[in-house]
């Protein structure tokens, strides 16, 4: 029996002007997700998906490249302004926000939503190198 050819659908341009940018910055990687106001994902990128491997994923430069990549995809979807929600203690927090501004997306709000424990779980021990 002949194999059927899959038809790929081109992504339709959604004219969504406002959005929310979620930046999760860990010590090992940085993830950027741009959603509409309901929370549906328009574009996403990470340092690992941008071609960085190993310890280079945790660098500010990798976060900058990932943010630019996600922002370009979101601009194609019609995003013009966004709120930024930053989560995590990583190195790529500020550089990801600056990269978003450099692409031309207007940032209306920057909010840090990193969960802070009221003396909950014991943190990992300090590294001795």
Curated annotation (Swiss-Prot):
Main location per the UniProt record: plastid
Cell compartment(s), UniProt: Plastid, Chloroplast
Family matches, as InterPro entries: Ribosomal_uS11, Ribosomal_uS11_bac-type, Ribosomal_uS11_CS, Ribosomal_uS11_sf
Keywords linked to the UniProt accession: Chloroplast, Plastid, Ribonucleoprotein, Ribosomal protein, RNA-binding, rRNA-binding
GO biological process: translation
Subunit relationships: Part of the 30S ribosomal subunit.
Listed name of the protein: Small ribosomal subunit protein uS11c
